[in-house]
């Protein structure tokens, strides 16, 4: 008499045969401990990790960020109030040159009082230019004030030290009477004005357009020097319309509709997989080489890097300017954009042909022009600026948050 054995019973019987020393059990335990215990404990406060506990930390981290920004804003204000000027009138923050190699144009509006965003940005650029020394003699700071009211205190203070272009100086304040011009179109027009003013005033080789809530990273000038003088001489990078220096960290994960990142992700697995396999085989005293084990560690490392956060692994590239990567740009966002002079003139023509509105801001307009005009654009990774503005100049935000 034969008795049938159920699939569940057969599975249990096979599981009982597995010993704690078997490869399958060890790798299963490693997976559970890594993704169920160690990684969540280590990463629950990392803002751009899948393990981040938003409900536990976000509100407090946002408040701490705002408080720190207030302190840094006050420090930047004192920095300029105490900054001496030669003969009491000659600016010392910038060194005038007949034709600068790079103009750094900072676009500013009157934002939330107390944070002094534009002062933070300009003071950081000033410090970095001083540290850079003779290598940055061809760099020119330029402030573009697009605030319609005359109450922009920070812009007035900076005018003692930095050349300023005021879009609405000496004009009638009748902008609000035109119902066809919304805030998104105005932002685009402001951008066009500042880019055009930079070209007309200095005729530089490059224009770096920086919004007044984008603080430069410490490595920005050595990296730009390397990129523009070495990397952008490569044929596939020549004649680019623009180079983005910032992409939101929350959009830097591998699981994104960008093919280049998928290739990079697979490359991470192919690099770390064999290394982890060798370590496992050595310490587990396993003879020979196992393709299934290597495949496991390839997938294991890919999953770990994605869940911890690609953003944090990109930070390793800051070890050297040559390690920064340049990849095709996506549509969001425009805190810092570098334009070669010929491309900047093409951009002015392109932007004059589009109209911006809610859902189609200047960043989307610039990105849409790439395909329409057959242009190319790139983004540098990791970011070369930090976005510190939680208060948008386009949207009211009474409860700002880091995410």
Curated annotation (Swiss-Prot):
A motif (DXD motif) lies at residues 211-213. Residues 1-22, 286-287 are cytoplasmic. Keywords: Disulfide bond, Golgi apparatus, Membrane, Transferase, Transmembrane, Transmembrane helix. Glycosylated. The chain crosses the membrane at residues 23-43, 265-285, 288-308. GO terms for biological process: GPI anchor biosynthetic process. GO terms for molecular function: glycosyltransferase activity. Its EC number is 2.4.1.-. It is a multi-pass membrane protein. Golgi-resident glycosylphosphatidylinositol (GPI)-N-acetylgalactosamine transferase that catalyzes the N-acetyl-beta-D-galactosamine transfer from an UDP-N-acetyl-alpha-D-galactosamine to the 4-OH-position of first mannose of the glycosylphosphatidylinositol (GPI) of a GPI-anchored protein (GPI-AP). This modification occurs after the fatty acid remodeling step of the GPI-anchor maturation. This is GPI-N-acetylgalactosamine transferase PGAP4. It comes from Rattus norvegicus.
